[in-house]
UniProtKB/Swiss-Prot annotation:
Subunit description: Homodimer.
Source organism of this protein record: Alkalilimnicola ehrlichii (strain ATCC BAA-1101 / DSM 17681 / MLHE-1)
Subcellular location: Cytoplasm
Protein name, as recorded: Beta-ketoacyl-[acyl-carrier-protein] synthase III
Secretion signal span: none
Name of encoding gene: fabH
A GO term for molecular function: beta-ketoacyl-acyl-carrier-protein synthase III activity
Keyword terms, alphabetized: Acyltransferase, Cytoplasm, Fatty acid biosynthesis, Fatty acid metabolism, Lipid biosynthesis, Lipid metabolism, Multifunctional enzyme, Transferase
Length: 323
């Protein structure tokens, strides 16, 4: 059996920084209120002429440079996003052409909200295990600020824009040890964007093409669910909590991150945290955090990583990876 191993990472943040103090001038909120409840101090926003694909392209190029591989060797591109450039073609197809990749290689988007990158890893891993691909590019990219109601202080303080990417290579030794993916549509109304083009554009103004969230309920389910997936991931591989070197969580909220760390009995010094400077970037948050910790030297070859995410749907998932 063939396995997938990470050989390169990359990330990209747009230039504009929006601080909590900037938001104080827009809505009824405060820097203290935001920091205490979320851990966020600032987030990034795309320029008017930037798209999700632009962010994904920059992250992909940096990951490919780090991996030192040719574009022609990439067999598969998966983009996890809920803010694609177009309804169709997929952002992955657009990116395939923009990067100058081999025509005929496989490219598609995957929509699982904040779990999109972990879902992408899980799907890519199966392509490797069946021997269908030799090399893949998995990306999480989002322009969340484009779907925010800037008058809704419950959501507009949380989200930011960005992209992260990894290059996966075929290996005889497991890099991705296992992935665990789940969803539960019962919770569809707690977090999401209630409008979509399939409902007709005449309904857009009535429903609002913006994120809506019942924050307290989302928090309760997220903490409970992520606790279970920690146990599931470890049990599937015959591992103990002490075996995990690094937790690389979805950067939704510092309180959710801390709750997962407590479940693992892991000190926060072994948890990669970027939510303070980036906010919740949905599917982009995990690959960006991973890239940050690899480039600054915290994560080293041979380290055992637990990636976990939770998002609208609800969707949730984990990936246990030997880096």
């Amino acid at each position: 059996m063939s396995y997938a191993r990470i050989i390169g990472t990359g990330s990209y943040l747009p230039d504009e920084v929006i601080t909590n103090h900037d938001l104080e001038r827009l809505i009824d909120t405060s820097d203290e209120w935001i920091r205490e409840r979320t851990g966020i101090t600032e987030r990034r926003r795309v320029a008017p002429d930037q798209t999700c694909g632009d962010l994904a392209e920059e992250a992909a190029r940096r990951a490919l440079e780090a991996a030192d591989v040719s574009l022609s060797s990439i067999d598969l591109v998966i983009v996890g996003t809920c803010t694609p450039d177009r309804v169709f073609p997929s952002t992955a197809c657009l990116l395939q052409e923009r990067l100058g990749m081999r025509h005929g290689s496989l490219a598609f988007d995957l929509s699982a909200a904040c779990s999109g990158f972990v879902y992408g890893l899980g799907v890519a891993d199966q392509f490797f295990r069946t021997g269908a691909v030799r090399r893949a590019l998995v990306i999480g990219a989002e322009t969340m600020t484009r779907i925010l109601d800037w008058n809704d202080r419950a959501t507009c303080v949380l989200f930011g824009d960005g992209a992260g990417a990894v290059v996966l290579d075929r290996s005889e030794e497991p890099g991705i040890l296992s992935t665990h993916l789940h969803s539960d549509g019962r919770y569809q109304d707690l977090l999401g964007v209630p409008w979509g083009p399939g409902q007709g554009y005449e309904k857009r103004d009535a429903l609002g093409p913006y994120i809506t969230m019942q924050g307290n309920e989302v928090f309760k389910v997220a903490v409970r669910t992520l606790s279970r997936i920690v146990d599931e991931s470890l049990a599937a591989n015959g591992l103990e909590k002490r075996d995990i070197d690094w937790l690389v969580p979805h950067q939704a909220n510092i309180r959710i991150i801390q709750a997962t760390a407590r479940k693992l009995e892991m000190p926060m010094e072994r948890v990669v945290v970027t939510v303070d400077k980036q906010g919740n970037t949905s599917a982009a948050s995990i690959p960006m955090a991973l890239d940050t910790a690899i480039r600054d030297g915290r994560i080293k070859r041979g380290d055992l990583l637990l990636l976990e995410a939770f998002g609208g749907g609800f969707t949730w998932g984990s990936a246990l990876i030997r880096y």
